[in-house]
Amino acid sequence: MSSDTFPTGALFTGIQCSTMHITDGDNTLLYQASHQHEEYGSGEWLHFTGTGYLIRLNAWRHPVLHLKRLGLSKACRRLVVTLMNHHPITLLHLDAAGDILPGIETFDW
């Protein structure tokens, strides 16, 4: 089956990078948010993977604003904005085994 036969919303693009690009505080907030079980909670777009997080950036019209409301750091939000501005991504996979992206701030926690 050719990829051009799928509806536009069926295809996802993403980037995987190291969790070193987020702070320890961001890690704590993402862990808590990804484990919410209420209907329409953050657990529907922030997913814990065991070694990081999968963030569905297309779940909200302004995902960075939602990350700010959750209390994530400017560095984390800057990472998301930078990646979204340079690449047409719908998913961000932050993973402990992910690559460190050049030119992006890192944290040793």
PLM feature segments, named:
Residues M1-N27, H93-A96, T106-W109:
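Short, extreme N-terminal segment that most often corresponds to the first beta-strand
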Residues S3, Y40-G43, R77-V81:
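Short secondary-structure capping micro-motifs at structural edges
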Residues G9-L11, H47-T49, H86:
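A short, structural micro-pattern
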Residues T13, T51-Y53, T90:
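A generic secondary-structure signal marking the coil-to-beta-strand transition
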Residues G25-A59:
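An N-terminal amphipathic alpha-helical segment
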Residues H66-L67:
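Surface-exposed cleft-lining segments at the edges of enzyme active sites
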